[in-house]
């Protein structure tokens, strides 16, 4: 079974935390990843070489690695350069996710250049994080092995909505041949199922599983609305 086939029809859990989260730290991310594996997840998405190394030692699942690096010179921060991609690969990720939007990068590299470097120098697969249909088509043409709706709603020019961009999933499935992954604001099993009904190859869920404070807040807010 190929690496991509291992992900087909399954749940990928994004194990990430912000510095101000109570569960921030590589040991916690590794524990979340192990819990996800025990629950039946088919893959893990993780940020930073440190977290990826810790998770690699804890689970046998495929890891989609990213490295979020902010810069005053660019809005692009998800694995914004070939150097960042190399660090992700060396940490143990089998698939490297990159921001595949056409926005300029601090490294001055193009999406195509980064994808080529990942394929030829690192021998890894590429997940292209995109925000629009046009970006998904361009990412496929640039050589991406799969596209993900990760950035829909997180760029000023894409739809701003509370739930997942299922319409983008539907559009991509009709226009690209590579696997389409649904990611972003998927909070319930019903929304995940709806993504698969739209043709998603796999689904990525993060905060709805791995950020307890957000999970708690959703329950609290729902209870308040009932009063």
Put a short name on every predicted segment.
Residues 16-18, 38, 67, 71, ...:
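Glycine-rich phosphate-binding active-site loops on the catalytic face of alpha/beta enzymes
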Residues 61, 122-124, 178:
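A short helix->loop->beta-strand "cap" motif at the edges of active sites that frequently abuts
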Residues 46-47, 66, 99, 129, ...:
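Structural motif
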Residues 22-26, 45-64, 75-81, 100-118, ...:
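Active-site-adjacent beta->alpha loops and helix N-cap segments on the catalytic face
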Residues 1-90, 126, 134, 138-141, ...:
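Conserved N-terminal beta1-alpha1 strand-loop-helix module at the mouth
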Residues 127-128, 170:
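Intrinsically disordered, low-complexity proline-rich segments enriched in Ser/Thr
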Residues 3-23, 27-30, 164-227:
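C-terminal alpha-helical cap/extension of soluble enzyme domains
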Residues 38, 90, 120-121, 141, ...:
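Residues at the C-terminal ends
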